[in-house]
């Protein structure tokens, strides 16, 4: 028996521990780093300077999950056309989004029911681009103004401030630790949404050299603030949530059964704020209307409020560890 151990029982426990670790390593459930700079207790009486640091692997990365699930549960691959008029490059060309009315994208976040919009290439505030899971709260946190001062500049909007201060502070510490920083694109347009989701996706991301028609005067083209991680959905997020059979422009979603209600999981039959600005005036933004279409909303401040559904992107180290995405067994998240 090794003299470091008091008796045969302790030695056997040590051997069994090593065998267990070896099996887990072979199965890929854990990984390890070897070091001789720290102490670890193998038993109540034995210390060793040479230790193995164990890292438990749980779940799949966002991209691994998407590639395994694409074509099932309503998850579909979308490919964008990228050109030099946009703030994004070829790394953003491929997304995976949940589409239609019959989707299994329920996820538990902050001990609440949220939904997965998709696995989307996302740029953080340091300029890193990774495939990350974008989620939206299943229900509204209430009806509010987009901006209490009557401006369609999202960086200074009162709703933006509320979401990243008052609302953020209601989240659990676990939930806060799962949220990654995100660059938000603030482009819009200067007429009714008589264009498709693909076109709107590009409008939302127009760069500074091509800002005319997509931003009101000097409104910023994006928000790159590490302290503002939470926003609301893009018009294109709502558009892509419709069935693949939906070919209508966003404005006419209300008139196409393939685009709304039972064929669009984001349609709640409620006026709901969207992120894009209406670039033709200072106090107008886009929203989903009561009948499922998307149009400029003049209620940004003057005459009313709309539902608010917080949206955020999880950090890249957050993985889906269990569940099947149904409302009965929503996906569960873990940090690796």
Indicate residue ranges for each PLM-predicted region.
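N-terminal start-of-chain detector that recognizes signal peptides
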Residues: 12-13, 26-27, 88, 282-283
